[in-house]
Design a protein with these regions (language model features):
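N-terminal accessory/capping or targeting/presequence segment of soluble
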Residues: 1-94, 139
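Flexible, acidic/His-enriched mid-domain "rim/lid" segments that flank
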Residues: 92-199
């Protein structure tokens, strides 16, 4: 992540921070946090730093994998189980601990989170320009290298799968396998075996 570019794009926003409430499925969340959390978690970007708030279940992994400056868990805010109200109380406390009284959220951010934070005195504005997406669109040299490495690995995996399938025979009448089944080394060539070759 290019923090200088991010700061430049967020500089004209009035709020104290930029907040995401999403899982790894959200490209902005993955980009900003560097964490592949399957369940939604909070990422706050404020004063040039990235702060995460994750469940206790994901805490250890987030500490080692995330690119955040700080990682905190729900239990740090006396929340482990509870409903929406308690969860949002925790969110507001997390923001205030970081000196944040106002946030900008992306246009696809959860309205439930935004409304509940407003009820707790946190100002929430929607970043209708989706600035984080614009930052993600321009890759750093390191990101370009990572994309290139991933592409090379994917191409090698596909070549291996193609070779496995190309080297297979088709079962005929009288073979141990049903006619028309692909065989490799005398055994049916299953999707699981192809997947193993790819991985």
């Amino acid at each position: 992540m290019n923090r200088t570019r991010l700061d430049d794009h967020l500089a004209d926003l009035d709020p104290d921070g930029f907040l995401l409430d999403a899982s790894q499925e959200d490209a902005n969340q993955l980009y900003l946090s560097g964490f592949t959390g399957p369940d939604p978690f909070l990422t706050l970007y404020a004063d040039g730093e990235v702060h995460l708030l994750v469940s206790g279940l994901e805490y250890g992994r987030a500490q080692t994998e995330a690119t955040a400056d700080t990682v905190e868990r729900h239990a740090d805010y006396d929340y482990e189980y509870g409903g929406r109200e308690e969860r949002t109380d925790m969110y507001a406390a997390f923001l205030r601990d970081k000196g944040v009284e106002s946030v900008s959220m992306p246009p696809r951010g959860p309205i439930g989170t935004a409304d509940a934070l407003r009820e707790r005195g946190i100002e929430v504005a929607v970043d209708t320009d989706d600035r984080l997406r614009a930052v993600r669109a321009v890759k750093t040299d390191e990101e370009i290298d990572a994309i290139r490495d991933a592409q090379t690995a994917n191409e090698a995996a596909m070549r291996a799968a193609e070779e496995l399938i190309a080297g297979a025979d088709v079962a005929a009448e009288g073979d141990d396998a049903e006619a028309g089944v692909l065989l490799r080394d005398g055994e049916p060539l299953t999707s699981e075996r192809v997947t193993e070759e790819i991985e």
